[in-house]
């Protein structure tokens, strides 16, 4: 039922994460039902929606750089209690809250690596996971080295964009 809801979303906007990756985020996050998630970069709310369907309490950071999407994502997730924060994701690093799942789909390329490393060490709980969209845009080997080479999975969508999932073990 939830996978059908995800499939029925509008994926026509160019920068929207592909349906295969939104479903993957949902399926991987279900094991944390009742836990917490931090999303960095929401655009139309597809990732937020999948995390909510998985039963997580979601805090979403988005600076609304893509104007016109704030209302769309809030409408999509109106049946859930999402903590919407209109700020860049770096603001999440200002508190001591850790999350079961962190989904990062904000900005990309080499300059994102320090932010991802900070989220890994300071925001992902032990036994939690970091999910990153567009991992093909930066040096994966460098990122892996900096976070201690954890267990990970990478998948590619039909557009060639990659989703990386990194598992944090005690």
Regions found by a protein language model. Name each.
Residues 1-18:
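Class I SAM-dependent transferase core
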Residues 11, 22-170:
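S-adenosylmethionine/decaboxylated-SAM
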